[in-house]
Regions:
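Extended alpha-helical interaction scaffolds
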Residues: 3-4
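Long, low-complexity or tandemly repetitive, helically biased scaffold regions used
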Residues: 9-15, 19-29, 36-94
Length: 94
């Protein structure tokens, strides 16, 4: 996957996960989808690609107009940490 395309995709997943975690009640399907999204983001964050994307962002090698919240030092870490708390309070209901 191309770097810019990957960052855009991860940014989209990042935004979707943040929004979904604010919902106090969700269907089992929505909860499963959120878990899968978090798993993809976690794998990205712990892998070489995030480190390279972050380094390239710090070196100003990425387009200035590229949305990059997923590359902030704390953004993705906080989302993954917030997930640990959110999954204890989200009510799953059909």
């Amino acid at each position: 996957m191309e770097q810019i395309e990957r960052i855009r995709r991860m940014e989209q997943l990042f935004d979707l996960a943040k929004e979904a975690m604010e919902e106090p009640v969700m269907t089992p399907e929505k909860y499963q989808e959120l878990q899968e999204t978090i798993a993809v983001l976690s794998e990205y964050y712990s892998g070489k690609e995030w480190k390279q994307d972050y380094a390239d962002d710090e070196a100003a090698l990425l387009p200035k107009d590229l949305k990059r919240g997923v590359l902030s030092e704390d953004g993705l870490w906080n989302l993954l940490s917030d997930w640990q708390e959110a999954k204890t309070r989200i009510i799953i209901r059909r």
